[in-house]
C-alpha cells in the first residue's frame, strides 16, 4: 500500500493541466484588462478627433456666412461620433457653451465639451468604465 502512494506522489502526469487551471483565470483577467484599456485609449483618441472635426466644421460654416447655433454644432458632433470611423455608442454627449468674454478680440469663443463612457468588456464583474471628458475651445471670426 505504501508503494502505491509513493507512485502517486512521484507521478507528474497531469501536472500541466493543474498548473494551467491555476494560472488561466489570472491570464484571462489580464487579457480582458488589456482590452478594456485599449477601448479607453481608442475612445479618448476618437473624442480628440471628433472635437477637431467639429471645430473645423464650425469655423468653415462661419467662413461661409452661416452662423450655426450651439445646438447645431452639438448635433453635428454627436452624428460624427456615432458614424464611421468612430462608431461610439449612445453614451456620447457633446455640449457647446458660448464664452461671454473671448480670449481673442474680434472673435466668438465657444467651448466644446465631449463626454463618453466606453463599453465594459470585463465579464462576470460589475465593472463600469470611467466617464471620459475632453474639452477644447472653438474660435470663429465676428464679422
What is each PLM-predicted segment?
Residues 2-78:
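Alpha-helical assembly-interface signal, strongest on the long, hydrophobic N-terminal helix that forms
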Residues 53-143:
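Short, conserved structural patches
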Amino acid at each position: 500500500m505504501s508503494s502505491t502512494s509513493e507512485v502517486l506522489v512521484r507521478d507528474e502526469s497531469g501536472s500541466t493541466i493543474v498548473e494551467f487551471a491555476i494560472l488561466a483565470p489570472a491570464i484571462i483577467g489580464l487579457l480582458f484588462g488589456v482590452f478594456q484599456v485599449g477601448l479607453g485609449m481608442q475612445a479618448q483618441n476618437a473624442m480628440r478627433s471628433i472635437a477637431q472635426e467639429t471645430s473645423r466644421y464650425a469655423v468653415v460654416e462661419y467662413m461661409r456666412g452661416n452662423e450655426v447655433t450651439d445646438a447645431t454644432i452639438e448635433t453635428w458632433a454627436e452624428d460624427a461620433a456615432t458614424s464611421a470611423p468612430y462608431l461610439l455608442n449612445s453614451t456620447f454627449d457633446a455640449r457647446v457653451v458660448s464664452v461671454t468674454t473671448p480670449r481673442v478680440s474680434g472673435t466668438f469663443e465657444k467651448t466644446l465639451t465631449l463626454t463618453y463612457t466606453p463599453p465594459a468588456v470585463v465579464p462576470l464583474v460589475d465593472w463600469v468604465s470611467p466617464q471620459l471628458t475632453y474639452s477644447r475651445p472653438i474660435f470663429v471670426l465676428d464679422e
